[in-house]
């Protein structure tokens, strides 16, 4: 869960605060904030687990490049990571707003829309006679990849992400999705 992209609602409290300051381990990576090809992950351990970690860490190899780690450290130290985060927040906020506009343009008010907690996705519940498998198959056959969240009596809920899609592709993809769910 990426709280740095939560801008449409109050951010979720950290696990550490929810656990009352008890033993919580944070594990993450910089793939979303920087480049997916930068395979540097991080782990934040509470002091009480550090000794156990050090005992086990010797059994594992470090696979991240030292040069990349040093460059990332300097990037963070110089404030560039914070600037990159602000830039991506603005970008994703704009793209999500555009996606919402295009959904309303194509589907009107006939589909329930829920905005994802991380601010980069929407959940649409589509009323269709298709099963989720049939919808997925028909969409795939026409070059549209769908992430189906659930199928229920109210319809099929699909997740639309704005983070990895160009804004100019929103309208054609949504138009195709509408055609797929409405055609007999």
Roles of regions detected by a PLM:
Residues 15-20, 105:
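Short, conserved catalytic or adaptor-binding loops enriched in Gly and charged residues
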Residues 24, 111, 144:
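Short, conserved active-site loop motifs that form the nucleotide-linked donor/cofactor pocket
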Residues 1-14:
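Conserved PLP phosphate-binding loop immediately N-terminal to the Schiff-base lysine helix
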Residues 45, 123-128, 145-175, 180:
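Conserved PLP-binding active-site segment of the aspartate aminotransferase-like
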Residues 73, 89-100, 111-125, 135, ...:
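Conserved glycine-rich beta-strand-loop-beta hairpin in the small C-terminal domain of fold type I
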Residues 63-69, 95, 120-144:
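Conserved N-terminal glycine/acidic-rich loop preference
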Residues 20-90:
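Conserved core segment of the aminotransferase class I/II
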């Amino acid at each position: 869960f990426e709280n740095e992209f939560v801008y449409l609602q109050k951010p979720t409290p950290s696990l550490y605060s929810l656990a009352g300051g008890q033993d919580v381990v944070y594990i993450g990576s910089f793939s979303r904030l920087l480049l997916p090809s930068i395979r540097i992950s991080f782990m934040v351990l509470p002091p009480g687990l550090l000794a156990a970690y050090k005992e086990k860490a010797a059994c594992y190899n470090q696979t991240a490049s030292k040069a990349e780690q040093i460059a990332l450290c300097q990037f963070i130290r110089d404030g560039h990571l914070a600037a990159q985060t602000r830039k991506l927040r603005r970008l994703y906020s704009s793209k999500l707003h555009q996606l919402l506009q295009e959904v309303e343009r194509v589907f009107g008010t006939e589909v329930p829309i829920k905005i994802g907690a991380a601010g980069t996705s929407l959940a649409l519940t589509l009323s269709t006679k298709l099963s989720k498998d049939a919808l997925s198959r028909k969409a795939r056959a026409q070059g549209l990849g769908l992430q189906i969240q659930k199928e229920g009596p109210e319809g099929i809920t699909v997740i639309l992400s704005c983070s990895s899609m160009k804004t100019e592709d929103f309208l054609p993809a949504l138009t195709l999705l509408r055609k797929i769910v409405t055609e007999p």
